[in-house]
Structure formats: C-alpha cells, structure tokens
C-alpha cells in the first residue's frame, strides 16, 4: 500500500500539485529510496539498499534525485503523529500554498490517545477516520488515508479483499467517498486472476469497492517489485496468443 501511495504522490507532484505525505510507518530516508527507484529508469531497489550500484545505476540515482528535488512533495515522518498533529501540519502547509493533496500512511498507526476514557479500539479508529474526513472538508483537499485489512480475506480461495475486511472499524467505509482495495494474486501463490484470467505475475489490481459519486469495478496495473515501479499492465504476447487460441 505504501508503494502505491508513493506513486500517487509522484504523479500528483509531476502534475504540479503540492503534496504532503504523513508517514507514520517509514522514515523519510526510506521513502526517498523508494522514490528514487520509482523515478529512475531501471534502478534495482536491492542494489540501492546494499549500496552496490553499477556506474549506470549511480548516474540514474543522481538524475532521479535531481528530478525529485524539483517536485513539490513534502514529508512529515513523525511516527507518533495524531490526527490533530496531522491537521495542524496540513493547515500550516496549506497556508503556504503547499497542500493540494494529503496522504496519511497509515490510519492504525496514528496516536489515538484521548481525554475520553474507556473507549475501545473500534471507537478510537472511528474517531480518527472521522477526523481525516473533517480535514478533507476543512482544507477542501483530497485526503488519501491508508488502512490495514484484517485477515478474513486470506480465508477465501482467491484471497480477494472486500469492504468487510477493513480493519477495526466500519466507520472507515462510512466516512470514505472512495474505497480502493489493493490486490496482488501472485502474493498468494495464484497463477492467474479469477475474473480476468490474466496471469498473476506482475499483476496488481485496484478494486473500487465504494465510489460515492461514480461506478465501482476493477482497475489493473503492472507492478515490478525489483524496480519498485507501478504502471500500465500488459499481458505477455505469449499469454495473449495462448488465450486467443483457447477462445476459438
């Protein structure tokens, strides 16, 4: 989910939008490494992590860093941030003209301490979800709030996630205008995706499970974990030829 969100941040930044990323899970340096790989043409994430880069990869990293430095993407990597802190940070950036999009990674890591006692976890998550919604309305910006799923989807044959899998609170579904569930069949050892029959290698899906003002459905994307890249999905020519023969 982090890789997908970071690609959204890059796309918005390239389009000239001011992006604020609140990362409660990863330090800013680690996000920077992922962005370098995403921005470069073919920079191996493993090579970057180990520091063992070829001459070509070094040049790619330098050029990617130069390009990234020009993008209006800002990071707050406070690991103990509450929704109130995130709101204050977003308000400050908005006052400077630096916040057209807010990304929060992720909901369950937010500091949910409150003066209200005897609240259960579901109530805490519901309050945090509601505050994220209020931030979006107050600042009049889209807020992308990442969230963990529970393990129920792993009990299904195809492991496909559903709205009911949103972890710890049904309020998330109620508050959100759009709910996008990420799904990669290959992670579960599946060789193809059930509905499309596409081969699972390199395949990712955005399942639009809720869209308040539009249609729901599935969107396919290509994923290369070695290069930390997300883009258009294209089945191999071999698969297309084989599938065409089987359809005859």
Where are these predicted regions, by residue range?
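Von Willebrand factor
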Residues: 24-27, 31, 120, 143-151
